[in-house]
Regions:
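Short clusters of hydrophobic/aromatic residues that line enzyme substrate/ligand-binding pockets
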Residues: 4, 40-43, 58, 94-95, ...
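Hydrophobic face of alpha-helices
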Residues: 24-28, 52-55, 74, 107, ...
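Immediate post-signal peptide segment of exported/extracytoplasmic ligand-binding proteins
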Residues: 58-74
Length: 130
């Protein structure tokens, strides 16, 4: 079997649903991987404590037989998607310190499906690709 950090979303969800691994184990492995490569600047907001707490909650839900498409699957998203729990800059100094009162629809749908956020990923200004 490949290393946890090499699994895609579908494989991680499969492993969690079959109870081959816990969400806490997966989340800890990915946090360690992120910390090992922290110097790359991939994350503008890294939230390992929040992710571990969410993973523990997901493990309880999984243990109770609850099912959701992404229950317990850790992921990260670009800093252009607003969240209630983390500041959003969209890669722009103009938005430094902005805290949204709501989650972007895509973020909310991921959370509703049981996903766990490791944090927000860096991007060029407003993710314009320029």
């Amino acid at each position: 079997m490949s290393a946890i950090h090499e699994w895609g979303v579908a494989e991680t969800a499969r492993q969690l649903a079959s109870k081959q691994v816990s969400s806490t184990e997966v989340t800890q492995a990915l946090i360690q991987r992120c910390e090992a490569y922290q110097g790359m600047g991939a994350f503008v907001h890294f939230a390992p404590e929040l992710a571990l707490q969410s993973a523990k909650e997901a493990d309880v839900r999984l243990g109770a037989g609850e099912r959701a498409a992404l229950l317990g699957v850790p992921l990260a998203h670009k800093d252009v998607f607003v969240t209630k729990t983390m500041p959003t800059t969209a890669g722009s100094r103009m938005l430094a310190g902005y805290q949204s009162p709501f989650n972007a629809t895509v973020v909310q749908r991921l959370m509703d499906a049981g996903a766990i956020s490791l944090g927000k990923l860096n991007c060029d200004e407003f993710a314009m690709g320029s």
